[in-house]
Amino acid sequence: MENTEKLKNSKEIVAYLVEKFPACFIAEGEAKPLKIGIFQDLAERLADDARVSKTMLRSALRQYTSSWRYLHGLKAGQARVDLDGNPGELLTEEHIEHAKQALKESKERVFASRRTNNKEEKAKQPRRPAPRKADAAAKSDKPKAAPKAVVADAPLVKVDAANLKVDQGVRVVLGKSPVPATIKEVTKDDVQVQLQTGMMLQVKFEHLVL
């Protein structure tokens, strides 16, 4: 008996589209530019498919086409493809420039969020009070002590995947410093989170900390 259980989130739907239309949707690497109006084609092809709703399909398609790897694939000379992988019209210069700008803005939002998080972490660190003049003069006569060994920061607390919930606040390790985020979807293999900038990311459990 065919499985008719509804797909629960965008990741599952994208994986389903990759399986059902492998000549059009790519799971890894640079994605192929999609034909304009491909949502309507998908809606017609999947009209009798009880596993996919139009609302979830639209959300999954939006996530797929706004991903960095999809935007990277929009280059001069590339042709848009339909669901069967047949090439159509070539990308216009306007669409290529729009993709470059969208990719640039998306990366800038992530990096800006990292910088903001770094500043917030530094601001939370307690400051030592300035020494009084008399104390400073007395200390200036003493020999300088050998530099102390650098004390490592306390280790980050990894999340327990079994206890993660939608709308829970976590931090995403994107570089040297974790970035605040809110959980939007929890799947078997990873989590969809929303950064403070509004950007949505799909990350593995090991990249989340409290």
Curated annotation (Swiss-Prot):
Entry keyword set: Chaperone, Cytoplasm, RNA-binding
InterPro entries: ProQ (IPR023529), ProQ/FinO (IPR016103), ProQ/FinO_sf (IPR036442), ProQ_C (IPR035236)
Gene giving rise to this polypeptide: proQ
Source organism: Aeromonas salmonicida (strain A449)
A cellular component term, taken from the record's GO annotations: cytosol
Function according to Swiss-Prot or TrEMBL: RNA chaperone with significant RNA binding, RNA strand exchange and RNA duplexing activities.
Transmembrane segments: none
This protein's name: RNA chaperone ProQ
Disordered: annotated segments: 103-148
PANTHER family cross-referenced by the UniProt entry: RNA CHAPERONE PROQ
GO BP, sorted A to Z: post-transcriptional regulation of gene expression
Domain of life: Bacteria
Pfam family, one: ProQ_C
